[in-house]
Amino acid sequence: MRIDIITVLPELLEGPFAHSILKRAKDKGLAEVHVHQLREFGAGKHQQVDDYQYGGGAGMVMQCEPLVNCIEALQKERNYDAVLYMTPDGTRFNQQDANALSLLGDMII
């Protein structure tokens, strides 16, 4: 199983992957985890990935272009069984979801 994770803060994931159940899976050769910096696909001199807020409220609005460009670049390298896009208003991840994902080969999160 290969898991490619796209994020603007890859350094935040170093700790959990070095000391968790994912580390044991990596050590046993059951999973590969690759973290990709979304800003590498951002626009302009500052590799911007966020957009202007609209409608008020707190939070960050992401541009779709950098994410699409990153996913397309990854898909050129290999075929993925799933592309998972997490949102704050999505469904809650549970054990049933984990069991279903464990049957897949490669995925992008």
PLM features per residue range, with description:
Residues 1-109:
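Post-transcriptional modification and biogenesis factors for structured RNAs
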